[in-house]
């Protein structure tokens, strides 16, 4: 059985059930002549255990396809050649480089992010642009196309309860990145940090092990008076809040001294 708490996706050890499901998927792809060529390029994949069974997803496109039987669909499918995105993208690509092309490209990307609408376990829904803007951020290109958000969004849309999750690499390494076939990796922080933090709201999630690490190694207050505080910060601890829900030195000081 999986633990009662859902997987903390940015730093985790996959459960035995997730490992077994991933191994079964790897074997299925390897033995299926129709699937094997689609993933030959190498692909990050994901497995989600729910109260209704297991779900599977791949990141981005596989063999140029966004929808493949046996895998959850993308949050938003922009690949229709007759759709607004592809037609506008083609017009922009044909333009001469310059300010207008850059502006139209940015507008199209923003249009796309407003099409990606995701939910959390509380039943709340926001689009990707809104989620990032609440943190004063602009979503990077490709946000929403990773396996983890696809899995969670599909589960929520079907009324399934997520229990455990893992993302692993299938195939050969590519693009200069060292990836090991079958090895599990944490969710990316740039694209998936703000997104998954929203989508996991309402679920009881495993604690961030880095938080536990910091609680064991509290900052040492060296000097304090009415105006200043001098603190020895543990190695690796963030000075100010970042993209992930990790305790920073500023969080610690505000909690302890109330200012």
Segments predicted by a language model, with ranges:
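RNA pseudouridine synthases
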Residues: 1-259
